Structures are given as C-alpha cells and as structure tokens.
Amino acid sequence: MNRRLTRGEIFALLGCLALIAVIAATGMPGRQKVWANLGLDGMQAQTELRLEAGDAYGEYGGGPYLDLPAGTYRLRWRISGDGANAIRLSCSNGVEIAPERLSTDPAVWEDEAVFTLPEAVHSFSIHICFCDGTYLRMDDLRLYSPVYTDRAWAAALLLLGAWLLAVIWRRLDAQGRQALALLALAAVFTSLPVLREDAVLSIDTQFHAARIMNLADGLRSGQLPVRVGGFSYNGYGAATSVFYPDALLVPLALMVLGGASITFVLQLFTVLVNGLTAALMYASARRMPGSREAALCASLLYVCSVYRLRGLYETFMMGQVLAMAVLPLFLLGLWEVCRGEAKRWPLLSAGATLIVQSHMLTTLLCALLALCAVLLCLPAMLRERRLPALLKAAGMTLLLNLWTLVPMVTLCLSGVNTGTMQFGFSGSALELHEVLLPDGFIGLPLLLGAALLAGTKAPADGRAARLCAVFGAGAVLLSTKLFPWSYAVRLTGGLIEVLQFPWRFLTLAVPLLAFAAGCGYASGREGTRMAAAVLALSMLCAGPYVGQVVREGEQMRFGEGTNPYMILPEYQIEGTDVGDTRSRTLLVEGDAQVTAYEKEGTRISCAVSAQSDAVLTLPLFGFAGYEATLDGEPLAVGLGENNRLTVRLPAGAQGTLRVRFVNWPLWRVCDAVSLLTLMAAVSAWVMRRRKRMRVMQSDSSCAR
C-alpha cells in the first residue's frame, strides 16, 4: 500500500486549508445563545407596577440565576413608564460586572445595553429598579451571549476530517472500506447524545469543564506547561493540572481561548474520544496478533461497551475515558515486550505515557497489570532475553513523564492534598449480576464472544486472545464482591483504597475481553458479516442506555458556563476552606495604598505605595511557586488567612506590583529532560521509518 500522499491529495489538503483560512479571515456567522422572554422572581412578561395600586419603590425581580462564562453580553428590554428607572445586574460570587447598573429612558420603550463579565459568574441575576415615576411595565427581557466561534471550528474540523477519511478510503480494499464504514457507524452511534445543541450534564461534567477552563486560564496567564490555573474556586486557583495531567486537553483549552463555547468543546471531546477509541483498538488488535475480522469485532465491542458509555455519559469520567481510548496501545506494547517482538518496546512506552497523561488511577491499574503479566511470562522473558526491552520501555516512560511526576511529588511534599473523597471501598464492589446482565457493565456481546473463543480450537497464534481472556476474567472478579476486598484493605493498610472503587478494574477487563471476544466472533468464515452482526448486537444492548441519555439526560445548556465554585477541596493546601472564597477583595494590613488593581487568572498587577511595613492578602491560594516583584525587584510572599497568598511591602515601597505563578527551577529541568527525550524518540522513529522505506524501495527495484 502506497502511504505517500498523491499530488491530488496534496492539492485537496491545500484547498481545505485555504478554505479554512478564508473562514478565519472573513468570519463565519457565529453562534449565539438568546435567553428570550426571561422571567424574574415575581416579574414575568407584562408585569406592571403602579404606586396607585400599592406598589412601592424598590427592587423587583431577581433571576434567572445563570452560571455564565466571562465575556461581553447584551441585554435587551421592553420597559415602559413615566420615570427614569434602572436595571441592576448582580451575581453571587463577587465578580464586578461593568456596568452594574443600566438606566432606562421613559421616552424609549425598547432599548438595549452591553455589559462585560471579566470572569465567570455564579447565579447571575437581573433586578428591576422602580425608583421614579408613577408606574413601570415590563413587557420583555432578553439576554444575548457573546458570539462564539463554534461553527468556524466545526467547519474546519469537518473539512480536515473529510480529507483524512478520503485519503484512508482510497488506500483500502473492499473489505477495509467495509471495516471503516462499520467503525464510523459505531463512533457516530455512541456520539448521538452530544449531536445536539447542548452537552450532556453528568456527575463530573462541571469538574472537568472547570479543568479545561483552568487550563485555558493558565495558558492565558503565560504558563507553559500549566501547573496552576486561576479559574477554579472562584478565581482563587487550583493545582489541578499537576495532579490531574491535562496535556492532551491543551487543544481544547486553545479552542476556548479561540472563542469556542465550553459546551461545544465538551461535545467535540466526546465525538473525538469515540473515534479515537475505535481507531486505536482496531489498529492495536490487528497487531496483537489477530485477523482483520477479529480486530474489527474487538473494536466494535469496545466502542459500544456499556461500561465505557456509562463512564462517558453517566459520570463523564473524562480522564478515565481518555485513558481507555489509548489503553489498547498500552496492551499492544505490553504484549510485544512479553510475548511478541521485543524490539517494538517503544509501543509500550508510548502507550504508558499517553495513559499517564490521561488518568493517574488508570496508570496504577496498568502498572498492576504489567506486573502480573511480567511475573507470568518471566521464565520465557529471561530465556528469550526480553528484560532489556522492558527496562528500556520503563526508562523512557519515566523520562517522558518526568515533567509530570516531579511537580506532583514536590507539591505533595509542600502540603498540597490530592483530594478528600472518602468512599466505602469494599462496599462499592459490584454484585455479579450487575456485571453479567445483557446490558450490564460487561454485557451480552462480550460474554458471547468469550464463549465462542472458549469453544473454538486454539490457532497457532491464539495465545494473545486466551491471555486477554484470562486477565480480563481476573479483572472482572476483582471488580465484584466475590473478591475479599475488606481483607485486602486491611492487608494493605488501606493503600489499595487509592483506587477509590473496585469496579475500576473493569477499565482493564473491558478492552481485554473485547479483544478475546473479537477473536471468538471472527473464528468463523464469514468475518465481515459477523462483524456487522456484532455491531448490531452491541447497538441493541447499548441502545436503550444511549436512547435514555438522549431523551431524558440532564443537559449543560449552550451559552452557560461551569460553576466557578468547587465543592470538595481537591488539590488544595491542607487546611484550606474552599467555601470561604466569596470575597475577591485585596486586603491591606498596615499603612499602604493600592490603586489600579487588576487581576487576570493567576496574574495580579497594581500600583502600591507603603508608608510603613505592610502586608497585602490577595484573592489567590498561596501555592509554592508564586513570585511577586515591585518594579522588577523581588518581594517576600507567604501564606495568610485561609492559605491566601500574602505579599510583604517594606516601608517606603512604591511602584508597580506584579504577581504571577512561575515554575520551580527543578520543574524547568524536568521539562527540558522530558522535551529532549521526546525529540530524541521522534527523531529515532523518523530515521527508522525512512530507512525502512529505502529498503522497501530497494527490494521493489530488485524485483523488477
């Protein structure tokens, strides 16, 4: 198969890029949310206030209590009266709305005004101020969101996606095209809940939306890589990016900075992760080894697995779902090192790195799986001298992720906690029927495929499928109450509870059983037809759940943002009260004046003049890494009440104070090491690929 782009494909790509440039330059019609006919508390449309009817001067209304992202909004109203009244805007998290008060002209029935939210607001409210004249009548009230660039992003991605699919399609035979069509259908089917205006609102949607906003805030503040963002906890900031790696989410954060709405970004993530899951499972299963039919069946089973879909839509475990998308690559690499071609050890390092950058708990699960696999295969690995390949993969994985692991450890040592979620670990294990029901966590399609595999004669290369079945069954057992988890908790001194729930072992069980079941389904002669039947069966079992999410699931409305408050003090300094973040004011202790105060995420600037020693307490949590300078000269920083960041001003200090978060010198060294390792790995891969292409061209010339 010729993998080089043809001249026509290159011209088509250039055409797509040119069209995208035109869209960016001319501006595609934006996407805007309109809240029409807004009803306020006690003031609906056509509500009239009259002094002669006993109504008094004062504020009326309140609501609609929206969580809105930062931006410029437009309020349009139809209010009549014989006096100069006003509209007051407010929120519950202390953000200064500019302007806060809008005047109504008695001579103008329909009018509008623009106001700005410098940061995300919680519980946005509109109040009608009846303060002049004898009557006031409100006929209509409309709120217009900022204009988002969702359509431009969607058009650009659709153009590039269509070009990529066309290039792949041209290189496939008839059977390959059938496989691509089935995989695309599975990805579209599992994305149905987000193919609408609003995103699905699940248990953790707000948390992961805040992660993206926190990441975008850190990028806007000039951090690269981002360690502390200033969005979470009402602008006080959180070190989420250190403990919950989000390097793979940077493109989504850049889209937010490019004007995309958070709901569109979450919808796009869902579609992309479904497509990525299908592609990586198919590509990995093809190499494990397995037939094309087995790989296709495995991918369809995996994409449509109820456990994965529940994690995507019921709880929106963004990190775990992303880790599950790249998990097949890790399994392929582990197979190559233990029983396949050991020289392919970079696959194990690549898969492990992607999992580390997705979800730390899945990383622990993969480490346990790798340990068990190595112990099981240790005699053969020693005999075949495979341990050097394993050590190379482990070493490269450590170097590639040094920039993530070292900041995590150092912040833990500095007093930052990793979460306060407490669960009854052994009590949250699953009952067996929850796993084995047709629409259960494992479900009928995987069970049928595994049964077919057990009933077929093992082919010469069937070791991979059977090993996957054994390890998958073991992971299923670990997820249920059949395993003595209460004893395991006591035996490990509670260390095992870091995994939070025993059912997380299904994260490993599902891809392992999917590959085993795929081989079972493909053991017959009608491989492609069987794959179509597998997809139909998977959709039949997953369909009721997907349909329920589409019809009844809660939604995160387009135009609204995520709550800037957080409920639990995760990734915070010990002893922090995250509920005490309503006050966003700068506190001054001592004889000092502060003017021209500006805060943007984790950056603060202001003009200061201190007649005596003074301490400024800033609305930022004081993570180690903040620096303060006065006209370029460093100042001492520390922790104040509720672990807020403090800056000490000496007597006579005068000038411009700037505060920002900077990476520790040790972190910068680790960043450089990981970057150099990545560059070396990519360079080595490119060189090997070019060498292989030259050998193939030489062999082709000799054959002629």
Where are these regions (language model features)?
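Extracellular carbohydrate recognition and processing domains
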Residues: 94-121
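Active-site-proximal, structured, solvent-exposed surfaces of multi-pass membrane proteins
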Residues: 579-699, 703-704
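Extracytoplasmic
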Residues: 189-190, 212, 216, 235, ...
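Membrane-embedded transmembrane-helix bundle of lipid-linked glycan/lipid transferases
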Residues: 2-29, 148-553, 658-704
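Short beta-strand-plus-loop segments that form exposed binding edges in beta-rich domains
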Residues: 126-134, 661-663
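Short, flexible loop/turn segments at beta-strand junctions in immunoglobulin-like
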Residues: 66-67, 115-117, 647-651
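Glycan-recognition and processing domains
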Residues: 6-72, 78, 83, 88-90, ...
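A glycine-anchored, Pro-Gly-centered beta-turn/N-cap motif
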Residues: 69-73, 120, 624, 652-653
